[in-house]
Amino acid sequence: GRTSIDNLCRIVESAIKAGATTINIPDTVGYTIPSQFKTIIKNLFNKVPNINNAIISAHCHDDLGLAVGNAIASIEAGVRQIEGTISGIGERAGNTALEEVILTIKLKEELLNVFTNIKHNELYRTSQLISQLCNTPIPANKSIIGSNAFAHSSGIHQDGILKNRANYEIIDPKTIGVKAVQLNLTSRSGRAAVKHHMHEMGYQDDDYDLNQLYVNFLKLADKKGQVFDYDLEALAFISNQEDKDQEHFQLKYFSIHSGSTGVSTASVKLLCGNKILNEIITTRNGPINSIYQALNNIAGLPIVLEKFHLVGKGEGRDALGQVDIVVKYNNRKFHGIGLATDIIESSIKAMLNVLNNIWLSNKIKSKIKNIKNKK
């Protein structure tokens, strides 16, 4: 946008005469808008006599948030190669997000009159891998590959999705390798979403009172934000008096010894119901791994840690550390959160949160089984 079109045409023509087979047209500082970039490309095709002897490529930056828009506009003008990166990773505000261009082409193939041979079902997995390798977290609201891209929390949207997914999804999540759509339970969720989650857990309509469950759900959602499946179970089947039993595993003491040798020793003491249990574990995989092994040995549950995320809350030496974890148990996912100035303590709190949720879920399953056996 900052180079005169006549100069650009002369440069492109000379480069092709010199043997260039691909000519890249860059918007290096993300300065142009789609209509402007489209005009530039059209002028090249109209004014450069040997333009068809080379592939014209576009290289756009996202300084104004228009990289993908400019890339699509350039395709409409005749460009046949787009330079970009997964997630738009790049200099300053980033480059063209390839996954957005790829999916746009797939959905608008007839309109754009172009196609790609990309394996679309590898997009999500590839983006996750690149995020890990580059240590660049993917924003939850990122188009196509963000965790919220196929997540629905509005009651109207959730009801529409359950009736016909095409109502609020322009593409099947499986197309890019996402296994399932998410219906997040929040204070905006309706009865249909709550009922759907209960059915997904195997409960029938006559197992619980949906109206009462929904009233209790809204109260919890207002306090907690997002409600998980095991929260619903507790609301549906555990009375207020029994809520006191939820903290079955309580921390009484912990100690960590770790040094430059790479060996960590964790000692932990828990109150489990009315029993005090101790465990000491030594590992070579760090203090958190040691303490988690010790906790798991006490709980005796076949759990698998799938996600561990640590983020600082505040600044300075007295800042809080928040640990969020996701644990898999019996093909279900349980979430835990812990907050403390000591990251080991916050890690323990997060795991105890998970263990207590699992314990309560097992208690509910046992209770329901006994009721059905009596019938």
Curated annotation (Swiss-Prot):
Q: What is this protein called?
A: 2-isopropylmalate synthase
One MF annotation (Gene Ontology) recorded for this entry? 2-isopropylmalate synthase activity
Q: How does it assemble?
A: Homodimer.
* InterPro entries the UniProt entry points to: 2-IPM_HCS-like, 2-isopropylmalate_synth_dimer, AIPM/Hcit_synth_CS, Aldolase_TIM, LeuA/HCS_post-cat, LeuA_allosteric_dom_sf, PYR_CT
**What reaction(s) does this enzyme catalyze?**
3-methyl-2-oxobutanoate + acetyl-CoA + H2O = (2S)-2-isopropylmalate + CoA + H(+)
Q: Where is the Pyruvate carboxyltransferase domain?
A: 1-124
Cellular component aspect of the GO annotation: cytosol
The organism is Buchnera aphidicola subsp. Thelaxes suberi
Q: What does this protein do?
A: Catalyzes the condensation of the acetyl group of acetyl-CoA with 3-methyl-2-oxobutanoate (2-ketoisovalerate) to form 3-carboxy-3-hydroxy-4-methylpentanoate (2-isopropylmalate).
Positions bound to Mn(2+): 59, 61, 95
